[in-house]
Amino acid sequence: EPELVKKQQEYESKHPEDNLTRHTAQGDTLPAEVKKSLTFLLVSISLWFVGYNGVSTWFSVYAENIWGMSLGQANTCLTIATGGAILSYIPIGTVASHIGRRKTIRFGTLLLSGSFLAAFLLTIVLDGFSPVLYILFLLVGLAWASINVNSLPMVVEMCKGSEVGKFTGLYYTFSMSAQ
């Protein structure tokens, strides 16, 4: 590991443009605008997880009471969403490398909101569950993957190489405490 640390330090000294921290008398610090972006991103991550986990936690109750589903049938819907996410992780990473992480996350948040709204409206119009809703669950998985695949790299790219563990810890603190 000391060899890797040395290589990382050499890289950072040759490429200061990749390092968002500034050296001050107190040590390396993030500029105010980067701290603001990091704070906004971490709060957003928490809210994404609170919202998604809130929906998925109460989904089986909703499916049973509104759609008359059994627990197994409700779990099928959530499994389809998870499958949609798993199938989307690698393609979403590729898309984000072309259009950017921020745009991909925005797409994901809009698709997630739109999918939930469409599922709600279809439930009203169709007066219950329809297999057409399975398509929306696939889209929910795609949307959730669009958000998740890109949020950790956005947090980590705000630090220098020696702080990746610290910033990864920040990400997981905000995402897991929201669950």
Annotate each predicted stretch with a short phrase.
Residues 2-43:
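Juxtamembrane intracellular "pre-TM" segments in multi-pass secondary transporters
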Residues 98-111:
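Cytoplasmic membrane-interface "Motif A"-like loop-to-helix N-cap segments
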Residues 111-128:
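C-terminal ends and interior cores of transmembrane alpha-helices
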